[in-house]
C-alpha cells in the first residue's frame, strides 16, 4: 500500500489539479517545513505539504481502494511523511514507528466504516476519504506524535468537524482536494488538540456527530487489545492497473474478453460493423457519463472505459488525455453504448459484476462477464506487477537509482532506523543532480 501510494503520488505531481493546489499552498510559509514529493526546491509547512501530496495521490484516481469503500492510504501516508520530516531530529522516527502509525490510520477508517451498512456500498452522498480519511489522518498523526488518550480523543472530535465532502464533485478537479483536505485537516486537528482545544467526547457515538454521515450508523464498543483483530489483516485492498474509478475495472476486463471475438491478429476493432454495446452494471450515477468531456469525467465513465478497451485493447495513463477522449472513433462508439442495471448487480465492490454484449450489424452477438478483475483483493496484483507500476509512475520524477532504493526501503520498512532516509528520496533530484545525470 505504501509503495503504490508513493508511486501514484509521484505520477500525480504532473497533473493540472496538483499544480493549482501547489500554487495555492505557496502563499503559506513557516520555519518548519516538509517536502513536496518530486519537488526538490519546494518545501511547505507540514499541513500544506500533506495537502498537496494528498491531492497528487488522488489526482488521477489511481490510488488503492479498500472494502468497505474508501481510498485508505492517501489521507494517511502524506501526513506521516510530512510530520516525520518536520519534527526535531531527536528522537528519530523509525520505519516501525511509521508502519504502526500508518496501520492505526487505516484501522480507524475501517472500524468507523464497519459501524454502518451504508459504507459497504459505493457512496451516494459523501466521498469516503473526506469523511473517514480525515479521522484516519488525525489518528495516524496522534500515534506518531505520541498523544495521550485524552488528546487523541480531542483530535478525533475536532477532525469530525472538518469531515465531509459531497459526491457531486466527483469527476471534477475538486475531488482530489478531498484527499488533500483530509490529510491537512487531520494534522490541524491534532495540533489544535495539543493546544487544548476541546470537542464533544461522544462525537463518534451519536447520530448528530459522526453518525450524520451515515443513515444507519451504529457504533459498538471495541474489544480489548488482547482479543483485537486488525481489519487490515484481511487485506481487502484493490490496486489499480489503470487510473480510473474502481468500478470501471470490471468493465475493462469484460470488454477485453469481448474484444477477442472481434479482433483477430493485428486488425483494428471493426467499429463500423458494431450495432449496439450493452453494459450490465450496477446503478452508480456518478460513473454513468455517456460523453465525457474531460480527463476526470473519462475516469468516471463506464461507457468511455468500455469503448477504449474495445478500440485499443488496453488502458493506460495516456488513455485519459484530452486528445484521446476526443478521438472520432471513441465518439462514434460512445453513441452505441447502452446501460442496463440488473437487480442482482448491487453497487458493492465485493459483489458487483459487469456483463457486456456487443451486437454486430449482421446480428451476431458476443457476451462476456467479469466477476473479478486482476488487482481486486480476490485476484491481487503480484509483487512484481506492483513494483512495475511503481517504476512506471515514479520514473518521471525520480532517477532510476532512487526508484530502486525506494522499492527496497519500503519492502524492509520495519527495519529502517531513521525515516529521514525515506523522506530524502521523495524530494527528487536537485537541479545540479539533474544536470549531472543528463551529461
PLM features per residue range, with description:
Residues 84-188, 202, 206-207:
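Glycine-rich, mobile lid/loop segments that gate access to catalytic sites or pores
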Residues 1-70, 174-184, 191-439:
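Terminal-appendage/accessory-domain detector
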